[in-house]
UniProtKB/Swiss-Prot annotation:
PANTHER family attached to this UniProt entry: RECOMBINATION PROTEIN RECR (PTHR30446:SF0)
Segments forming domain Toprim: 83-177
UniProt function note: May play a role in DNA repair. It seems to be involved in an RecBC-independent recombinational process of DNA repair. It may act with RecF and RecO.
Gene3D superfamilies, A to Z: 3.40.1360.10, 6.10.250.240, RecR Domain 1 (1.10.8.420)
Provenance organism: Francisella tularensis subsp. tularensis (strain WY96-3418)
Keywords: DNA damage, DNA recombination, DNA repair, Metal-binding, Zinc, Zinc-finger
Keyword hit for Ion transport: no
GO molecular function, one term: zinc ion binding
GO biological process, any: DNA repair
Family per similarity comment: Belongs to the RecR family.
PROSITE patterns in alphabetical order: RECR, TOPRIM
Protein name (Swiss-Prot/TrEMBL): Recombination protein RecR
Superkingdom as given in the UniProt entry: Bacteria
């Protein structure tokens, strides 16, 4: 239907926008038409910034967060607590925790969860890098801030099994409903979740 209404180039923009999370058919059409008709300069600015970012952004060699440098700002910050390592699923979780101001340690971003049905295993989550970081640093606590979904539980269990017994492993959970995503929690709930974390 859209091919009869829109030209091939407009349809291509709409289909590209539909690949973004939470963007459906109607939203992608609205965005495409706004950018092309009402604000072409915004479209060009977005395209240029994305081209520049994709050419220059990489993953931090330590925590796997997106950064322009080999080491991100948090990993290079000497004021952060090197003995605490918080394992999270995505940078959105990092943003939520940082904005809540509840944690001053370092992170490791999994960029996903173990999900055999989706072809995601330990190697896709760079758990070998995580294991090396834990071995190299004097870490006394690993905090698993992983969403309590089925895949999240599997991931948390796998990670807890690969960590040395002399390292404290804790899991946030208070106020985090099963199936809930960490990035959507309000700051007060996150604060309670961190303060009430339980040992594994």
């Amino acid at each position: 239907m859209t091919s009869k209404i829109f030209s091939p180039k407009i349809s291509a923009v709409i289909e590209s926008l539909r690949k973004l999370p939470t963007i459906g058919k109607k939203s992608s059409q609205r965005l495409a038409l706004y950018l092309l008709d009402k604000s072409p300069e915004t479209a060009i600015a977005i395209a240029n910034s994305l081209l520049d970012a994709t050419a220059n952004i990489k993953k931090c060699v330590y925590c796997q967060a997106l950064t322009e440098d080999d080491v991100c700002n948090i990993c290079s910050n000497t004021n952060r607590d090197d003995t605490k390592l918080c394992i999270i699923e995505s940078m959105l979780d990092m943003i939520a925790i940082e904005e809540a101001g509840i944690y001053r340690g370092k992170y490791f971003v999994l960029n996903g969860r173990i999900s055999p049905l989706d072809g995601i295993g330990p190697s896709e989550l760079k758990l070998d890098i995580l294991q090396q970081i834990i071995a190299d640093r004097k870490i006394d606590e690993v905090i698993l801030a992983i969403s309590p979904t089925v895949e999240g539980e599997t991931t948390a269990h796998f990670i807890s099994q690969m960590i040395a017994k002399d390292i404290k492993i804790s899991r946030i959970g208070f106020g985090v409903p099963f199936g809930g995503e960490l990035e959507y929690l309000d700051q007060q709930t996150l604060l309670h979740a961190f303060n009430a974390r339980t040992n594994i």
